[in-house]
Amino acid sequence: MTSDPTSSTAFVFAGGGSLGAIEVGMLRELVASGERPDCVVGASSGAINAAYFAGRPDADGVAMLAALWCRIRRQDIMPFSMRSLVAMLLRNRPHLVEADALRLLLERNLPYRRIEQAALPLHIVATDVLSGQEVVLSAGPVVDAVQASAAIPGVFPSVSIGGVELVDGGVANNTPISVAIALGVRRIVVLPAGFACALRVPPRSAIAHATHALTLVIARQLVRDLELYGARAQIHVVPPLCPLEVSSYDYSQCAQLIDKAAERTRAWIDAGGLAECVIPGQLREHHHAAALSH
């Protein structure tokens, strides 16, 4: 971070499952417009974007991150099978699948091994599974930190770091604006994944249903945080895609999400979005399905 925190900028990446691809489109246009953060903060799936961008914070790095998202399939993140379900039941284990696939994905693609080796100061948020308290990881093995931050309770196993069992950062603080403020940052650009506000029918699988519900909670909490911290920092929130029909469990449309988010973000920047500190209406409770059906 720069020596003068009052003039520094943080990018804050929220969680949102597969909708994390939207943040990559936002990031592409922010970087193209000349935005250069002094640090990055991320939680849950946003920790993946934060960690990758911190390692290569330029247009080429964003392009490589976009290519990664376009290659990801759900089985690369959550390799569910009847075998994994039976194993959970028979072995009485507290998670559905092992995180080997996610860990391998991170090890193959992150260009550094320790958080302190990143080109930008990186702060990853996880949750103490016993106390529910937020844990900010600013040093140590980056793969462990990201894996912990993305460890959805009940789906993935917790990750032990420093003797503390950690799970998804979204449980404690999914859009960690407060972390950036505690670091002394006074200008924050928030990249929210948003939520599927135009689903015509509820998600069919249990996991898809749960992740969609979480994105609704995330958006509501983000609005509250923006209202709470708005007087303590200059906070710019990139509007998420709206209307959006893609579930946070659907990894088949990442390329389209990236391109559409980039287009919308460019229009927002051109309209002076980075000069305003407002809460986008797209984050507030709403639904479009009824309107789209006509």
Regions found by a protein language model. Give the residues of each.
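Short acidic, glycine/proline-enriched helix-loop-strand junctions
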Residues: 197-222, 231-236
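Active-site-adjacent alpha/beta core region of enzyme catalytic domains
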Residues: 78-196, 228-279
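Short, basic, helix/turn surface patches
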Residues: 65-76, 213-226
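Catalytic domains of lipid- and phosphate-ester/thioester hydrolases
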Residues: 1-38, 49-55, 63-66, 185-188, ...
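Amphipathic repeat-derived elements
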Residues: 13-21, 27, 40, 150-169, ...
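Intrinsic-disorder/low-complexity, polar/charged segments
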Residues: 18, 114, 202-209, 250, ...
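Patatin-like phospholipase
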Residues: 4-102, 106, 138-148, 192, ...
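Short alpha-helical interface patches
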Residues: 48, 115-118, 213
